[in-house]
Amino acid sequence: MPRCLIIGCGYLGEAMVGSLLARGYEVMATTRGGASRTERLASLGATPVLFDTRAPGNLPASDAVISAMAVDRTSGQTMRDVHVDGLRVAVNAIPDKRVAWFHVSSTSVYGQEHGELVNEESPCEPTDASGHTVLEAEQTLKSLIPHATILRFAGIYGPQRLMRTAALMAGDPLRGDPERWLNLIHRDDGAEVVAALVTGNQQGQLLNVSDNQPIHRGDFYVEMARLLGAPTPRWIPRNPGEPWGPHERNNRRIDSSRMLALAGSLLSYRDYRSGLPGCLADHG
């Protein structure tokens, strides 16, 4: 039975466990410890592996590795500590550097902000510290594992992962520009794409991962409000000089045609209209 190790098994990683198990993989997933987290991973069918990049040890041998590391706000670590330095520590803990490696990155590496259509050949010129860190992580991994596949995820949505739900239900105005572009991928579809690439041993790829249906932010929240039975959203502009919120600066259209050619048939949610109802079932 082939073995896959997930380094950083959070919201997306938990879904990947099921997708990999369904494809006949033995799945191992790292955790820094704690009974609740260990029990959670075991309940999903993964073998928990204790690993902390601040006190590193060795990681078990596997046929494939998926790195999907994210910052735990309670850890006191910075984004760079985890995404760059932590990734380097993880690579060094792997016994065989020839292992197939799949890295979950982000479309934040692109800096386009004027509605441009962006594919994998577009220049990476991030405009904020987060994007710079994510790009540095990609570069660090490729310097250590040249054959690694880089997966640049658009915004991940899914159950318990929808912003502004409370504001919509309360009828509060939303701050920002409803005409800015939004790029999305349902969590379960993202997990299926990664698992399919692992199974197909698609090494050395660079892929954007989205549903390939860019939408205006306003349209997304209008649909959310409709499903919630909430008032149609009202928008108010940002104040001059007000810092951008998370992901609000983004205003580009992600082209994921390359990914769709490899794994597009696996997508269950072709756009937000098909994906949102299941995400909001608990609010019905």
Give the label of every model feature segment.
Residues S62-F102, E136:
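NAD(P)-cofactor binding segment of oxidoreductase domains
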Residues V89-T127:
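Conserved Rossmann-fold NAD(P)-dependent oxidoreductase catalytic core, especially the SDR/UDP-sugar
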Residues H132-L135, L144, I156-M169, A196-L207, ...:
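Glycine/proline-rich active-site loop of Rossmann-fold NAD(P)-dependent oxidoreductases
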Residues V193, L197-W244:
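Mid/C-terminal beta-alpha module of Rossmann-like enzyme folds, strongest
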Residues G13-E14:
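N-terminal Rossmann-fold NAD(P) dinucleotide-binding loop
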Residues T165-R187:
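A conserved pocket-lining segment of Rossmann-fold NAD(P)-dependent short-chain dehydrogenase/reductase
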Residues L50-R54, H247-G284:
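C-terminal amphipathic/interface module of NAD(P)-dependent oxidoreductases
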Residues H114-I150:
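Catalytic helix-loop patch of NAD(P)-dependent Rossmann-fold dehydrogenases
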